[in-house]
Curated annotation (Swiss-Prot):
Lipid bilayer topology: Peripheral membrane protein
Key words of the record: Acetylation, Cytoplasm, Cytoplasmic vesicle, ER-Golgi transport, Golgi apparatus, Membrane, Phosphoprotein, Protein transport, Transport
Region feature Disordered, mapped onto this chain: 168-188
Gene name linked to the record: Arcn1
Ranges for domain MHD: 271-511
Residues the record lists as Phosphoserine modifications: S223, S244, S493
Signal peptide per UniProt: none
One cellular component (GO) term of this entry: endoplasmic reticulum
Protein name according to UniProt: Coatomer subunit delta
GO biological process terms held by the UniProt record: adult locomotory behavior; cerebellar Purkinje cell layer maturation; establishment of localization in cell; Golgi vesicle transport; pigmentation; protein transport; retrograde vesicle-mediated transport, Golgi to endoplasmic reticulum
Amino acid sequence: MVLLAAAVCTKAGKAIVSRQFVEMTRTRIEGLLAAFPKLMNTGKQHTFVETESVRYVYQPMEKLYMVLITTKNSNILEDLETLRLFSRVIPEYCRALEENEISEHCFDLIFAFDEIVALGYRENVNLAQIRTFTEMDSHEEKVFRAVRETQEREAKAEMRRKAKELQQARRDAERQGKKAPGFGGFGSSAVSGGSTAAMITETIIETDKPKVAPAPARPSGPSKALKLGAKGKEVDNFVDKLKSEGETIMSSNMGKRTSEATKVHAPPINMESVHMKIEEKITLTCGRDGGLQNMELHGMIMLRISDDKFGRIRLHVENEDKKGVQLQTHPNVDKKLFTAESLIGLKNPEKSFPVNSDVGVLKWRLQTTEESFIPLTINCWPSESGNGCDVNIEYELQEDNLELNDVVITIPLPSGVGAPVIGEIDGEYRHDSRRNTLEWCLPVIDAKNKSGSLEFSIPGQPNDFFPVQVSFISKKNYCNIQVTKVTQVDGNSPVRFSTETTFLVDKYEIL
C-alpha cells in the first residue's frame, strides 16, 4: 500500500484539510480533489473510484467526504481499513462534522494523520495510541524550561551572595566604629515593612558565616563615609528585592560541595547535515522503607537529515547495555540488518530517509524492579522528637558513569508551621512557603560527588515528608546505546554527523 494523500473535502471537491505523504504540489492535490466528485457514480454503492493514475477510496461523512488517494496497485482491503481509522480520528477532534469545525482543528487532524501514515505506509497504531502520541509532552520544551529555570536560580543565588557580602562588609565597618549614614533602612522601617508583608517574607539564613578579616583602621573622612552610605543603600535595595519573592535560600560550605561542582553550561551543539537526538525518559517509584516498586525507561534515536545528498545512509549502533533493554526498530528499517550487524538502514536501500524532519529509527524500553538498576537512591529518615521531627535525607549515585545536572529533591512540609531549621547540607536549599515544600538543589551529581545529605528540623509527623520527588537532566544516557558511525549506502564512505543526548525524568518518587 502506497498512500499518496489523505483529505477531508466538500461534496463539490473543495479541500478543507489535506495531508500529502509524498512530494506533491498544491495545484496537483487540488486538481485531484476537484476531479473526485465528477468520477463518482451515484447509482452504485462502491466506496472507491479509479482513474488512469490513482485510486480514490472515500467515505461520506454527512456533507463531507473523507478521501484517501492511493496508487492503483495498492491493496484495496488495507486501504479500506486505513480509511475507517481516518474516519474514526476526525470525531476525536471535531465536535461536529462541519466545514468550519474541521478548519478550526486542521492542525490537530494533520498531526493525527501523521501518526497513521509515515512515508506513504500505514503505521501499526490504533485510535488510543494516536490519542496518546498527539497529546505527549515535548522533550525539547522540557529541556528548554529546565535550563531556563536553572539560569534563573543561578542568577538569584548570585544576587543573594552579593547581598551577603555587602551585609558582611557593613558589619565589619560597624565593628571598627565606622557606622555610616544610610543604614537606617535596616531599622524600624525595615521591620515594619516585613511585618506588613508577613505572607511573603524572604530570609537569608547564615548557618556558617564566612570569616572575613577586619579591614585595617584608617582615618575616617567624609569621602569614606559617603562611600559606606552608598553601599548601605545598595544593600537595602537587595533586601527589598529579596523580601518580595517569598522564598528562603541558603548556601552552605559545611558539606562536601565546593566550587568545582558549579554547573558549566555546554556550548550549543554544532548540527551537521546528519544529526541524531538520543532521548531517554525515566519513570520510577520507590518505597520509603526500601524496595523498587517500578522503574520504566523509554529511549529513542531521532534522525534528522538537512541535506538530501545524505538521504541514503546507514547508522552504526554500539549497544553496550547489560541491563536487558528491549529494542525495536521502525517498520521501514531493515530489522535483519540491524540484528545481524547493528546497522540501521531502510528495507529498500534505494530509498532515502526524509529530509528536514525528525524520524524515530530506533526505540528501546526497560522495565524492572531490580534495586541495583536505580540510578540515584534517596533515603529519607524522619524521626520524631519532643518538638516535632528531625529529618535526615541522603542521596547516592549508583551509576558512576552518569553525570546528573540541575538535581532538585523536593520534600513536602507540614502547613502552618513556618520554615524548617536547617542543620548540615550539601548544596543549597529553597523553602517555598506557598507550596509548603523544601527543595534541595544540587548543580551536579557525578562520580566525584556521588553522595550527600541534608538535615533539618520542623514540627510535624513522619508521614508529612512523603512523597519525595526528584528531577534532573543528564547529557549521558542511561542505557549506553550510541551511534558511533554513519556511512553512505553506496561506497560505504563515512559521513560527518552530530549527536545530542538527553536523559530526563518523567516521574521519580519515593512514596
